Structures are given as C-alpha cells and as structure tokens.
C-alpha cells in the first residue's frame, strides 16, 4: 500500500536519460504493447522463479527470517524494473494498459492457480493436518494479488509529468 502512495517518488528516482531506460527505448520490440507485455510477463515469471528457488534453498538452511530478506530484495528489484518499464514507455495510454495487462497477468494466473489448489486441497492420508499447506497457499494468493495490483499500477499509469 505504501508503494502505491509513494509511486511518484519512486518513479522520480528513475531518470529518462538512464542507461536501462535508453536501452529499452532503443529496442524495436518495446514499441509494441504486446511484445513488451510479453517481456514484462517473462520478467515477472523469472523474478518469481528466482525468489521461489532461493526460498526453497533457504528451507535447507536454519537461518530465521532470511526468507523475508529474499522476498524484500525480490520486491525491490521488481519495482525497479516496473518503474523502468513505466518511464521508458513511449506510446498511447491504451497501449500502455495493454502492456501492463499482459505483463501483470502472470500474477493473475499464479493467484488463480493458488486459489484452485487451496479449494481442492485434500489430505493424502487420513488425519493429515493441512493447516500449513492452506496457510502457504493463502500466502501465495495474497502475494499474487498484491503483486498484480502493484505491477499494473506501476506499469499502467504514467507519472503526471508524462501525461500528454
């Protein structure tokens, strides 16, 4: 929630003349909302996969709260990338929404999958406690919804100075 409130301040830290922004603007695929949306979708998939991999690795290490650091770093890197997509986009508002919708749809798919798994959760043997599995699936669902909204807002709505 704080990220959405301070979106303008976060976006103001990314410069139009920055290396990453200029690199994206020079790419021919970035001009199309569909191809840039697919790249954003793949970026979100990659970041979620990397964070999930590190959290899986951390289950083997007995260091408490380190998973929160990994989640925080993944969130910061994702918001940084979404901000670069926002600043680098040159095109109509309608095409920006297309790009944001395609790119953030990964989190909608992840949320629907987590909801399906939660609703169809059954014990594998009689007496199995499913509390932790249900809690994990609810956490994935909440994270997916928050990431969906944050990604869409950061990539789909320009800074006020960018409106034309």
Predicted feature residues:
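Membrane-interface segments at the starts/ends of alpha-helical transmembrane spans
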Residues: 97, 125-142
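Hydrophobic alpha-helical transmembrane segments in multi-pass integral membrane proteins
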Residues: 105-125
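Alpha-helical membrane-embedded segments
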Residues: 1, 108, 136-153
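Generic alpha-helical transmembrane segments
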Residues: 64-86, 106-112, 141-146
């Amino acid at each position: 929630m704080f990220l959405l409130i301070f979106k303008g301040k976060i976006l103001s830290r990314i410069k139009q003349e920055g290396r990453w922004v200029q690199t994206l603007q020079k790419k021919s695929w970035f001009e199309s909302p569909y191809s840039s949306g697919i790249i954003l979708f793949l970026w979100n998939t990659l970041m979620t996969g990397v964070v999930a991999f590190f959290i899986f690795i951390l289950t083997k290490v007995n260091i408490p709260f380190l998973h929160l650091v990994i989640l925080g770093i993944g969130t910061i890197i994702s918001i940084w990338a979404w901000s670069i997509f926002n600043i680098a986009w040159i095109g109509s508002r309608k095409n920006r929404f297309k790009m944001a919708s395609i790119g953030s749809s990964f989190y909608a798919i992840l949320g629907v999958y987590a909801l399906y798994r939660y609703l169809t959760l059954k014990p594998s043997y009689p007496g199995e406690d499913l509390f932790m599995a249900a809690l994990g699936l609810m956490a994935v669902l909440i994270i997916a919804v928050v990431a969906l909204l944050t990604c869409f807002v950061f990539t789909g709505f320009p800074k006020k100075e960018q409106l034309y």
